[in-house]
Structure formats: C-alpha cells, structure tokens
C-alpha cells in the first residue's frame, strides 16, 4: 500500500510538472509578444510604465514556476561557496547597497549549484529590499556549511518569523516580504535548504535588522 501511494504521488508530481511546462511556455509567449509590441511604440512615460509591469509579470511567473517545480531535477556537484557568496556581494552592490562577505573553512561543498545559489540569492535580495547594508558570512566545518545573511533593516518580530516562510503571506509591519516581490522568495529558499537536508532559521541580527541562517550538512 505504501509503495502504491508513493507511485501515485510521483505520478501526480510528474503530471503537475508537465502541465506547468506547457502553461509556462504559453505565458512566456504572450509576455514576449507584449514586449515586442511595446518596443514598436517608442519611448514615453506611459510605455515605460507598461514595460515595467510586463517585466514584473515575467519575474512573478518565473518565481511561481520555480516554487511549484522545486529543484529536485538538478544534479549535485562540488561548488565553490566562497566564490558564490562573492558573486552575491557584487550583485548586491550593483543594485546600490553596501555589502560585505567573509568565508571561513574549506570553500568547496557538494550541493545542487543553481538551486543553492537561488536559495542564497533569495535571502540576500530579501535583506537588500529592506536595508542599506547586507553582510554575508559563510563557515564550513567537518559536518556543516553555515551561511548567515545579516542586514540593518527593520527586522521581523519573533512571533512572525516562521510565518514569513508561508507562500504569499503579507506581513502587517514595516518588513512586508511581498513588498516589491512575489511573496515566494523565503518559501523557495527554505524548500531548497530542506531538500539539501538542512534548514533556514531567522533571528535578530547584531546589525539591528534580520539574520537569516542557512545550515546544510556537507
């Protein structure tokens, strides 16, 4: 009975993934057509506003699909985590935020590279959305890889920290994770961390804002 249930679940996931692939292709086609038509209209404040909306819709579509699809199809590979954190620091500074990075211990860890980068990028972009400075720190020992993302933003009250991992949740305070985003970033990040055998926790940062900690076995 357990084996039959497992087969049914796997079949349902496969059907869902196939359906999502078809839907995503159709929606991407429509959005691409919008972009081409807008490009023919020339430059004006109205056209630029519509272009921004279309870009936002495209980003939301990709986030929804990433959440529904998961990351289990990617193969694990040795990955330079220190180099990955440096890439995230540069991306953060390109968007106008101050950022620091530090890594301690052996830098190579076997993870699913694209998925793990998405996990960390979601945490860093969430921090940057509400703060002016983001500090990224990695540490690897013989058992665990730990990455912390600290910021100087408004933080999240202790009683709400688990709630922000729920998809599409809107907080009622200054740090609304859906502000300028899809409301899926932290949910996707935690799913990826857990699929690596680890987890993400949130706490108060010594910088005054939020500390997000990713911990996965090595």
Task: List the predicted regions and their residue ranges.
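Membrane-proximal coiled-coil signaling linkers
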Residues: 7-52
């Amino acid at each position: 009975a357990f084996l039959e249930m497992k087969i049914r679940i796997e079949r349902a996931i496969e059907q869902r993934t196939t359906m999502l692939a078809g839907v995503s292709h159709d929606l991407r086609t429509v959005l691409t057509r919008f972009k081409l038509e807008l490009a023919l209209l020339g430059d004006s404040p109205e056209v630029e506003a519509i272009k921004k909306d279309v870009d936002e819709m495209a980003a939301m579509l990709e986030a929804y699909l990433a959440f529904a699809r998961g990351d289990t199809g990617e193969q694990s590979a040795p990955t330079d985590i220190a180099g990955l954190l440096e890439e995230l620091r540069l991306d953060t500074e390109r968007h106008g935020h101050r950022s620091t990075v530090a890594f301690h211990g052996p830098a190579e860890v076997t993870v699913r590279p694209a998925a793990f980068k998405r996990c960390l990028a979601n945490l860093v972009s969430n921090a940057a959305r509400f703060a002016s400075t983001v500090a990224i720190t990695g540490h690897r020992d013989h058992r665990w890889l730990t990455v912390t993302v600290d910021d100087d933003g408004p933080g999240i009250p202790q009683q709400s920290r688990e709630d922000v991992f729920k998809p599409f949740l809107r907080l009622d305070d200054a740090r609304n994770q859906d502000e300028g985003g899809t409301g899926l970033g932290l949910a996707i990040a935690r799913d990826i961390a857990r699929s690596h055998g680890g987890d993400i926790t949130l706490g108060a940062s010594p910088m005054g804002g939020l500390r997000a900690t990713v911990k996965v076995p090595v």
